[in-house]
């Protein structure tokens, strides 16, 4: 594919290029998930999907949620603590007051415009106990989207990293 030795030529414009691009994105996404799942002591995988109008802002918010130790430990414990998600995203976006943030966890709305909404707590608690949990962030605007994958922060992770020296 890279060397050109196969003799296959794909025109940059057209259906073949589109199909090849889609297949490549699917392959790279699967590889990224494998890397995350192979993390030290990882038990669960989180996926943050952020949608809104500013791609840079979405990336900042999604990465802040994915990198938050509190969100990672909530994921590990199967805790649908959406306040940790709001804190991580809001803390990464200073000057957005109050943060016009919508949050869904596993498709269940828990926060709209920065405020709690009524939801089925037992259904949400059951939904976050799976091996993969999706967190959706909605920020002002439309048209852009980003996704970030992350692993939970487990007791095993702490033990593995505390037991060796460099």
Language model features by range: what are they?
Residues 1-166:
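A structural signal for small-residue-enriched, beta-sheet-centric alpha/beta enzyme cores
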